[in-house]
Design a protein with these regions (language model features):
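Bacterial N-terminal signal peptides that target proteins for export
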Residues: 1-11
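Bacterial N-terminal signal peptides
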Residues: 10-19
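Sec/Tat signal peptide C-region and signal peptidase I cleavage site
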Residues: 19-25
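Short beta-strand/turn micro-motifs at beta-sheet edges
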Residues: 25-29, 78-81
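Immediate post-signal-peptide N-terminus of mature secreted/exported proteins
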Residues: 26-50
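An amphipathic, aromatic/His-enriched active-site/gating alpha helix that lines ligand/cofactor pockets
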Residues: 27-30, 61, 65-73, 95-143
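Short hydrophobic/aromatic beta-strand micro-patches
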Residues: 42, 93-95
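N-terminal, post-signal-peptide region of Sec/Tat-exported proteins
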Residues: 44-88
Length: 148
């Protein structure tokens, strides 16, 4: 009997320890928010409006299709004054509900490419053709931390 009481007491102590650590985890001064992807774009001289025409048509169609599918929460386009020739002049910003919204992104992207461009091959060609009017400097994916 004494042995079973010791086991019960040990089990209770372990449960209490885990309860305390989960309570501590709930005390973060923030909660996880949306996931944000920011693409940095530099348009080539004289091609800002050419690129923005594509953004206002095809890119917007892609984002609206992703919103309709429930993958994208919102999106926006920001313009910025570049400091150097290698700085972006446009940021394309896409907001996702969470990291899980990015699961299966290749298949989702292919489906949207087929719907907006006719085929993945046509979308790839169009992507390459836009190199004559802009440079993609990179992108970052980050998560919003909502302060409590």
């Amino acid at each position: 009997m004494l042995f079973s009481r010791q086991i019960a007491a040990s089990a209770a102590l372990v449960c209490l320890a885990f309860t305390g650590s989960s309570a501590f985890a709930d005390e973060h001064p923030y909660s996880e928010g949306q996931v944000v992807n920011v693409s940095s774009i530099r348009t080539l001289d004289g091609h800002f409006d050419d690129y923005m025409k594509w953004v206002a048509t095809k890119w917007k169609q892609e984002q609206e299709a992703a919103k309709k599918a429930g993958d994208v929460v919102s999106y926006q386009v920001l313009t910025v004054e570049p400091r150097t020739p290698d700085d972006p002049d446009i940021f394309l910003v896409i907001y996702f509900k969470n990291w899980a919204a990015l699961d299966g992104s290749i298949a989702k992207g292919d489906a949207i490419a087929k719907a907006t461009e006719g085929s993945v091959a046509a979308a790839n060609k169009a992507q390459g053709d836009r190199a004559s009017i802009r440079r993609i400097l990179g992108s970052q994916t980050m998560q919003v931390l909502n302060l409590k």
